[in-house]
């Protein structure tokens, strides 16, 4: 996968070049192309923004340098703008994007984009109902969530399949050594060696975590008969 990022602050993307994603870059499993659209200005001072027509506070990013930066790319794939008014990013979107050959992100700053910039994008996406100083951090979050799903990025191929949101539930609790830490013991079922019981425990605990912390995720979920029974047990245990 190739990912292009149009940004005024390419140095902000250094974190994507370390850890598992960094190793993936080195191994050629994905490619990151950072494009500073200030380089596509034509005036002496390299302005990328101007005052808004009709008046108002702040500065608005101009379409010209962004359009020229896009046109400079041999290809773009799906073009994505990060903005507060966009649809909220989620795991399903990450899974869909991970199937693409190429993605291009456009990062905003200041008071946002000239409205005509949005016409250049296929999707406008947000990471939540709050405002940041620019689109770089949301873009990095979305790149991380997407790239980690690519083959060979994570050490354990099963990891992205088993974790939170992959099956529509939050992740079950996990434990490692020691089995007893200051009286806090690992649930016996996890050390029993009974894989069926362990799977049942994990399923129920994932359902419990979702019920307690993200009940909204259960509203649209078609619960199996087994899950309905588990949920009744969970509610009874919590009463």
Swiss-Prot record:
EC number: 2.1.1.228
Record Gene3D superfamilies: 3.40.1280.10, tRNA(m1g37)methyltransferase, domain 2 (1.10.1270.20)
GO cellular component, one term: cytosol
Keywords of this entry: Cytoplasm, Methyltransferase, S-adenosyl-L-methionine, Transferase, tRNA processing
BP GO annotations: tRNA N1-guanine methylation
Record localization: Cytoplasm
A Pfam cross-reference name: tRNA_m1G_MT
Catalysed reaction equations from the record: guanosine(37) in tRNA + S-adenosyl-L-methionine = N(1)-methylguanosine(37) in tRNA + S-adenosyl-L-homocysteine + H(+)
MF terms (GO), sorted A to Z: tRNA (guanine(37)-N1)-methyltransferase activity
Principal subcellular localisation of the protein: cytoplasm
Binding site for S-adenosyl-L-methionine: 108, 127-132
Record text on subunit structure and interactions: Homodimer.
Role of this protein: Specifically methylates guanosine-37 in various tRNAs.
Recorded family membership: Belongs to the RNA methyltransferase TrmD family.
Protein name: tRNA (guanine-N(1)-)-methyltransferase
Species of origin: Lactobacillus helveticus (strain DPC 4571)
High-level lineage: Bacteria, Bacillati, Bacillota, Bacilli, Lactobacillales
UniProt gene name: trmD
């Amino acid at each position: 996968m190739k990912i292009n990022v149009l940004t005024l602050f390419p140095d902000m993307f250094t974190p994507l070049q370390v850890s598992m994603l960094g190793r993936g870059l080195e191994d050629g499993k994905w490619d990151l192309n950072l494009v500073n659209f200030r380089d596509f200005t034509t005036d002496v001072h390299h302005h990328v923004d101007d005052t808004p027509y009709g008046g108002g506070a702040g500065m608005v990013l101009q379409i010209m340098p962004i359009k020229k930066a896009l046109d400079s790319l041999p290809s773009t794939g799906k073009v994505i703008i990060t903005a507060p008014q966009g649809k909220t990013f989620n795991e399903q979107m990450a899974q869909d994007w991970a199937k693409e050959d190429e993605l291009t992100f456009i990062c905003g700053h200041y008071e946002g984009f000239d409205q005509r910039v949005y016409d250049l994008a296929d999707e406008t996406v947000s990471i939540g109902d709050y405002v940041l100083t620019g689109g770089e951090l949301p873009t990095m979050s979305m790149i991380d969530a997407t790239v980690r799903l690519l083959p060979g990025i994570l050490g354990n191929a099963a990891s992205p399949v088993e974790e939170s949101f992959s099956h529509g539930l939050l992740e079950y609790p996990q434990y490692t050594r020691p089995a007893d830490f200051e009286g806090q013991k690992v649930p016996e079922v996890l050390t029993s060696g009974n894989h069926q019981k362990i799977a049942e425990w994990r399923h129920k605990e994932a359902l419990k975590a979702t019920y307690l912390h993200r009940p909204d995720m259960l509203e649209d979920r078609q619960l199996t008969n087994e899950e309905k029974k588990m949920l009744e047990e969970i509610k009874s245990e919590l009463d």
